[in-house]
């Protein structure tokens, strides 16, 4: 399960303002702000939509010792 902090970090890594991510996930910018701040707990569907939009944008979520997020490595091919 992704956290509001991960969502905010992923959005920042992509350089996306809230008004770019929110419509991709089908939520309002106000709701996105509240999710990122931990003031609103999104539904499973909303979390899935946010995760899908961010992953499509080029990030991947990690869950090692602590939850995190990083940019995907693109265009690398094995020789």
Segments from the language model and where they lie:
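DNA major-groove recognition helix of helix-turn-helix/homeodomain DNA-binding modules
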Residues: 26, 45-63
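Short basic helix-loop element that most often maps to the first helix and adjoining turn
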Residues: 5-20
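Helix-turn-helix/homeodomain-like alpha-helical modules used for DNA recognition
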Residues: 59-79
